[in-house]
C-alpha cells in the first residue's frame, strides 16, 4: 500500500505488458506489476500502474 491507496487486483485482468502483450503478476510487497517474459517490473504509484517501459525496473 502506498499512502491510503491500494492497487485493485481486478485491474490485472485488463492489463498486459506493453512490450510482450503477456499477462502480469502483482508483487504486493514492492508495489509492482511484473512481466516475466520482458523481465521488467512496472511501478504502482498511488494505486495507479505506470505502464511505461522508461519507468520500469529491469529484473
Swiss-Prot record:
GO CC entries: cytosol
InterPro entries: Trm112-like
Residues spanning the signal sequence: none
Ranges in a coiled coil: none
Pfam families given in the database record: Trm112p
Family of this protein: Belongs to the UPF0434 family.
Descriptive protein name: UPF0434 protein Rsph17029_0141
